[in-house]
A protein has these predicted regions:
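A cytosolic-side transmembrane-helix exit/cap motif
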Residues: 29-35, 107-112, 140-145
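Hydrophobic alpha-helical transmembrane segments of multi-pass membrane transport proteins
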Residues: 7-77
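Alpha-helical transmembrane segments and their short interhelical loops
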Residues: 1-3, 49, 55-125, 129, ...
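Intracellular alpha-helical coupling/juxtamembrane segments of multi-pass membrane proteins
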Residues: 28-48, 58, 114-128, 135, ...
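Short cytosolic juxtamembrane segments of multi-pass membrane proteins
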Residues: 212-222
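Membrane-proximal juxtamembrane linkers immediately C-terminal to transmembrane helices
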Residues: 4-9, 220-222
Length: 222
């Protein structure tokens, strides 16, 4: 695609997306396996079972923070000059990923106790997560390929919304932020970011409800 020839600071664009998708992949995968991996504790010690996927998500965030710090230090050398709103977008993008991965982790983690094949579904989702978000390419290319309606559907992916927010907060302030450059991220980054937050919260509620319903049978299934 030769994106490095059409986008300023493409390395920042790429890395800012990768660190966020790595957070999602690690938190989602580990949360899904958390109950099964701690089966001895689940069967012998009474603890809130949600503790295991939550702890897995916290560990993923701890692993993510040094990567984010390195990224921001590099951006500082490239003239990073974010506005207050752009800084908030970084926080919101990370928050969306944490909420989303925890919600999905609770959902698939509960199912995985009874049906171990659920982990294979998660692995399939993670396999495509990088390609279904604007990390290796920009949103303008998606619009050209899918058209306006296809772009809207594409942007409804909450991971896409979160990555867009991080690009807006991290990558955009290292550029001149001209209309042509900002168009590479799409014109509705903030709106789709808020939609991503709502979708993630809904999935968190669904995940918690399913987890609470199935946890009564955890001990016998493990």
């Amino acid at each position: 695609l030769k994106l490095n020839q059409s986008m300023p600071n493409f390395a920042v664009y790429l890395f800012s997306g990768l660190v966020l998708i790595n957070l999602f992949n690690e938190a989602f995968s580990n949360s899904t396996k958390a109950v099964v991996d701690n089966s001895a504790l689940v069967k012998k010690v009474y603890l809130p079972r949600e503790l295991f996927p939550v702890a897995s998500s916290i560990i993923a965030v701890v692993n993510f923070l040094p990567q984010l710090i390195v990224l921001l230090v590099v951006c500082g050398f490239l003239g990073w000059h974010p506005s207050f709103v752009q800084v908030l977008c970084i926080v919101l993008g990370v928050l969306i990923i944490v909420i989303l991965s925890l919600g999905l982790g609770l959902l698939f983690g509960a199912i995985n106790v009874a049906l171990r094949d659920a982990q294979n579904i998660v692995d399939m989702i993670l396999l495509f997560s990088t390609w279904l978000s604007p990390i290796l390419y920009n949103v303008k290319l998606v619009e050209e390929a899918l058209g306006p309606i296809g772009l809207v559907i594409y942007n409804l992916n909450p991971v896409t919304g979160a990555v867009g927010l991080l690009h807006y907060g991290v990558w955009a302030p290292t550029t001149a932020q001209t209309p042509e450059i900002m168009a590479l991220m799409g014109s509705d980054v903030l709106r789709f970011g808020l939609i991503a937050l709502m979708v993630s919260l809904i999935l968190l509620v669904i995940g918690q409800l399913v987890f609470s319903r199935l946890e009564k049978s955890f001990a016998q299934n493990l």
